[in-house]
C-alpha cells in the first residue's frame, strides 16, 4: 500500500508543462482538441500519483475513475512545438463523483480550459463512494453544480451525416475500452465542414453514456444546428454511447 501522508503543502492548482508534438497537431499545425483532453488525463494521473494515489492504490481497493462528461474550450491558437502550462484541480464533488478543471496557458495567456466529470466505480461497474483518504488529500467543496449533460434536439430538417466504423485496437486504453479522448476525434470526423472543426474559439461538450470496447461496430449521426454541430454515437446493436456537440 502506498501511504498518502500529510499533503497539506501540496500546491493548488497542480501544474505541469506539455510540449505539443508533431503528431499531436492537425493539418493546420495547431493542437488537436483530443490532444488537450489526453493532456488532462495525464496531468490528473500525475497529480494523483504525487499525492500517493497511483494505479496500484486503486487496484488494491477495486475502484476506478471513469469520465462521465467532458467540456473542452479552445480559446486561442496553440501551434505545434509550443510548450503550454497546464493546471488541474478538483473543484467540486458529491458522494460518487468529482469535477476537475484544467486551464492551458501559452505565454501567460489562457488559451483553453477543460472540465472533466469523473465517477468512481467498483469492479462490477457500480457507483462507489469516494474514500475518505481522497477527500482528505483533495480538499474541495461540495459541488453546487450537476454532472455535465448534453441535451440534443431532434435531427434537423437538413440532411444528417451518418457513417459506421469499428473500434480499432490503438483506440483502447489500459482499462480495455475506448479512451474518452478518441470520441472527440470521432466527433470531428463526423463534421464535413472543416471551418467548424478549425474555428477558434470553439467548444466541445460530451456526455458519456457507455463505453465502446474492442471491435465494436459504431454508428455516428451528426447534423448542423445553426453554426454548431450535434452528434449521437451508438453501437451497431442500438445502445447509445455518446451525446456530443461542437459549438462555435
Predicted features along the sequence, with ranges:
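Hot-dog-fold acyl-thioester-processing enzymes
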Residues: 2-67, 113-115, 121-203
Amino acid at each position: 500500500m502506498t501511504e498518502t501522508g500529510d499533503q497539506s503543502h501540496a500546491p493548488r492548482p497542480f501544474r505541469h508543462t506539455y510540449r505539443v508534438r508533431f503528431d499531436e497537431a492537425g493539418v493546420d499545425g495547431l493542437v488537436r482538441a483530443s490532444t488537450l483532453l489526453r493532456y488532462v488525463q495525464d496531468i490528473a494521473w500525475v497529480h494523483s500519483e504525487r499525492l500517493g494515489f497511483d494505479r496500484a492504490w486503486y487496484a488494491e481497493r477495486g475502484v476506478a475513475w471513469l469520465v462521465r462528461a467532458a467540456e473542452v474550450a479552445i480559446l486561442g491558437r496553440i501551434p505545434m512545438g509550443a510548450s503550454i502550462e497546464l493546471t488541474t484541480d478538483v473543484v467540486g464533488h458529491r458522494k460518487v463523483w468529482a469535477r476537475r478543471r484544467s486551464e492551458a496557458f501559452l505565454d501567460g495567456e489562457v488559451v483553453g480550459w477543460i472540465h472533466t466529470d469523473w465517477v468512481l466505480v467498483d469492479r462490477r461497474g457500480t457507483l462507489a463512494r469516494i474514500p475518505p483518504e481522497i477527500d482528505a488529500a483533495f480538499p474541495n467543496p461540495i459541488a453546487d453544480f450537476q454532472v455535465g449533460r448534453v441535451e440534443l434536439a431532434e435531427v434537423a430538417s437538413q440532411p444528417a451525416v451518418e457513417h459506421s466504423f469499428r473500434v480499432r485496437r490503438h483506440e483502447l486504453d489500459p482499462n480495455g475500452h475506448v479512451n474518452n479522448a478518441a470520441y472527440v476525434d470521432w466527433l470531428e470526423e463526423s463534421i464535413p465542414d472543416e471551418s467548424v472543426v478549425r474555428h477558434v474559439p470553439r467548444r466541445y461538450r460530451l456526455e458519456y453514456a457507455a463505453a465502446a470496447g474492442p471491435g465494436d461496430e459504431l454508428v455516428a449521426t451528426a447534423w448542423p444546428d445553426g453554426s454548431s454541430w450535434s452528434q449521437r454515437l451508438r453501437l451497431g446493436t442500438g445502445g447509445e454511447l455518446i451525446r456530443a456537440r461542437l459549438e462555435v
